[in-house]
Design a protein with these regions (language model features):
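Structural and coupling elements of P-loop NTPases
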Residues: 1-690
Length: 690
């Protein structure tokens, strides 16, 4: 593929609810533009964009894919994003690389939660928005019902461009409201002009909707509209184009991807409606001092690019997908990674069509491509010229709120699992992985059950590692509520030097996260040189509480008496004596189990606020407050025991149909209710006996 100036490059992110047909629309475009020699079908597992084995198996996109086409002198970079909520990280990546968002809507199912979330993501990224109502060959499709829902949901900016003429449930004639011409589609994508169908007042009403939208783009056109004067075709084209670019108009196209009906009309309009990479304007980055810097889409400027996606595959190697904002990226252009501060050597650059790689001389300003073998570079990094160091905006990923413990099927493979999950997290930064040294578990977090299920599948398919998920353990604590004194006496005689240590220690509650050690020994009952050994013995002992084996916190231990033997006493004997004092005394100090409490901030629609508050109470939580967040959304703040939050991500998604989200973080420890504590203690004892 030849190189294009940024003025002739369009970067389009395809988004929408799962199953709306966005990948099918993209495949239809690739086929029409001869970028693919077949019309890929998801059901057949032969699409260009859903090429991953997991995508083929699940018949759904789970990661962002890229494919460029050439259409009437314009390069269009298609960025296909996932529709499943569990893979929303891919949407964030796609929106970061795009200048326009095409939101695909099912003609049968209409506007869904995924439609709303796609619009929200596009708005957050500041992108131009367009709609495509797909699947109109389905007899259950209802274009005009869907169109009215789009207008009522997203406002008067929604403007029809191409509409179907439906007879007996069949939509093979489409009217372009710009040129007021009709086109008839037949088998194998055949298309021919046809007479305007008799659609009664509907057609004129749709045409009037365009005029109203155009009138809003300038005072001059508004005056003309109010005076009842007709717009010229040129004024309509310019008005709509301006309105689309400034966001006051969201054009609606339609068709059927499986039959390639009206796809050409969308492409023809796209070339003059969508803002080019150059037209989007400059990005604002920051320099080394944190000061804002304008980075313009200029082919002759210093290089600056954002890495918006990473592939780390054991078979094809590592690929970093980049959107070049300024300058160009090529093997002869030196760049540095602004996160690491180190230079990155570029051996070659690629154009990606799904998984197919094609060498290219360079990736120019406004364009998208990939760089192989950048080992230290991660998604979200900025690559730029050392002559002009700048950090571009990264990627705002959704919070990974669903956590599970991960165990290898084969004992001893823990390191293999950790390394493999780390590589998967390089590809998908919404995968979080930590080793909890307290519970001795590896914990993996993601966006939902299906997300982590894919992780398990990929561990097997990519790295031949079998692993399983289970509910993570909770890091409880133990403390005391009563002051006691206890003796620890250790004596061992077995020929030669023996072992002797004797201590009296006072234990009492104290405001500390671990152990406060003190001494008030008089008369040398315990020599000072053994004090550190006593403290060490206690610090080792508190790692395992007397109730359920959890660490003991909030305790002060004061060494106040004891005895020693001038020959047999040693650091080891006093260390052991201290641990015996702990074991003898703590059971009498009213030991108490503590549970971790977290702060919950749930953002949900107004209609779900009562459900969420009720669920918080059911989970032993306390609602701390509520506040409106605008647009019919409320933020519920609460404190909830961490033990009750394992499946909260699933609950909030189900109750809000995917509209809700939440953040949850540890706050403090509190006394565990007696009935809950008893279950925890019994479970700990049962595990210890296994």
């Amino acid at each position: 593929m030849k190189q294009y100036d940024a003025k002739k490059i369009l970067n389009i992110a395809f988004a929408g609810h799962s199953g709306c047909g966005k990948t099918s629309v993209a495949e239809s475009i690739l086929y029409l533009a001869k970028a693919s020699d077949r019309l890929g079908k998801i059901a057949d597992g032969n699409t260009t964009l859903d090429f991953d084995s997991e995508e083929i198996k699940r018949q759904a996109s789970i990661m962002t894919a890229v494919a460029p086409i050439e259409w009437k002198g314009t390069k269009i970079n298609i960025i296909d994003t996932p529709g499943l909520f569990d893979f929303a990280g891919g949407v964030a990546e796609g929106m970061r690389a795009a200048d326009t968002a095409l939101i695909v809507v099912s003609g049968k199912d209409g506007v869904n939660v995924g439609t709303e979330k796609a619009v929200e993501a596009a708005n957050a990224a500041g992108l131009t928005k367009m709609f495509f109502v797909n699947g109109l060959c389905d007899e259950d499709a209802r274009f005009y019902r869907v169109f009215e829902t789009l207008k009522s949901t997203f406002g008067p900016s929604v403007c029809p461009v191409v509409v179907p003429y439906i007879v007996d449930g069949k939509a093979n004639v489409y009217v372009n409201l710009f040129d007021f011409k009709a086109y008839e589609y037949g088998p194998n994508g055949a298309v021919k002009p046809t007479a305007l169908p008799d659609m009664g007042a509907r057609l004129e009403g749709l045409r009037e909707a365009i005029k109203e939208a155009v009138a809003e783009t300038s005072e001059e056109l508004l005056d003309k509209f109010l005076m009842g004067e007709e717009f010229t075709p040129e004024e309509i084209v310019l008005g709509v184009s301006q309105g689309v670019k400034d966001g006051s108009i969201c054009p609606v196209f339609c068709g059927d991807a499986h039959n390639t009906f009206a796809i050409d009309q969308f492409l023809n309009s796209l070339t003059w409606l969508a803002p080019s990479a150059a037209a989007k304007g400059e990005e604002i980055g920051v320099d080394l001092d944190g000061e804002p810097v304008e980075v313009s889409v200029n082919a002759n400027a210093a290089a600056a690019a954002i890495v918006f996606k990473t592939v780390a595959d054991p078979f094809i190697g590592r690929l970093s997908y980049v959107k070049v904002v300024s300058g160009k990226i090529s093997p002869d252009v030196p760049v540095i990674n602004m996160r690491t501060g180190a230079p990155e050597r570029i051996s070659k650059v690629l154009t990606m069509t799904g998984k197919k790689q094609s060498d290219t001389d360079y990736i120019g300003a406004g364009d998208i491509g990939a760089i192989p073998k950048l080992v230290a570079t991660k998604t979200g990094d900025t690559l730029c010229s050392p002559l002009r160091k700048v950090v571009l905006d990264g990627i705002n990923y959704p919070v990974s709120s669903y956590s599970m413990a991960i165990y290898p099927a084969k004992k001893g493979d823990e390191d293999k699992v950790a390394q493999a999950v780390g590589k998967l997290a390089d590809e998908d930064p919404t995968i979080k992985f930590v080793s909890n040294h307290e519970t001795h578990e590896m914990v993996i977090s993601g966006l939902g059950e299906q997300h982590l299920d894919v992780v398990i599948s990929r561990l097997k398919s990519k790295y031949n590692i079998d692993a399983k998920l289970q509910k993570p353990k909770i890091a409880y604590r133990e403390t005391i509520r009563k002051k006691v004194s206890a003796q620890g006496r250790y004596k061992k005689q077995s020929g030669g030097h023996g072992q002797f240590g004797d201590v009296w220690i006072e234990f009492e509650p104290f405001e500390t996260d671990s152990l406060e050690f003190a001494e008030r020994v008089v008369g040398g009952a315990v020599p000072k040189n053994f004090f550190p050994a006593v403290e060490k013995g206690l610090r080792d002992a508190i790692k395992k509480g007397v109730l359920a084996g959890y660490p003991t916190v909030g305790i002060k231990a004061t060494l106040y008496d004891g005895s020693y033997h001038p020959v047999d006493s040693s650091e080891m004997s006093f260390k052991t004596a201290a641990s015996l004092a702990y074991k003898n005394g703590i059971p009498n100090a009213m030991p108490t189990l503590l549970e971790p409490i977290g702060s919950l901030k749930a953002t949900v629609p107004d209609s779900n606020m009562g459900d969420v508050m009720g669920e918080v109470n059911k989970r032993r939580g306390r609602v701390m407050g509520m506040s409106p967040a605008g647009h019919g959304v409320q933020v519920v703040e609460a404190e909830v025991p961490m033990a009750e939050m394992a499946d909260f991500a699933t609950f909030i998604r189900q109750i809000t149909q995917g509209r809700g989200s939440f953040e949850f973080s540890f706050v403090r420890y509190e006394d565990c209710p007696a009935n809950v504590a008893q279950k925890v203690i019994e479970a700990a004892k049962a595990e210890a006996e296994e």
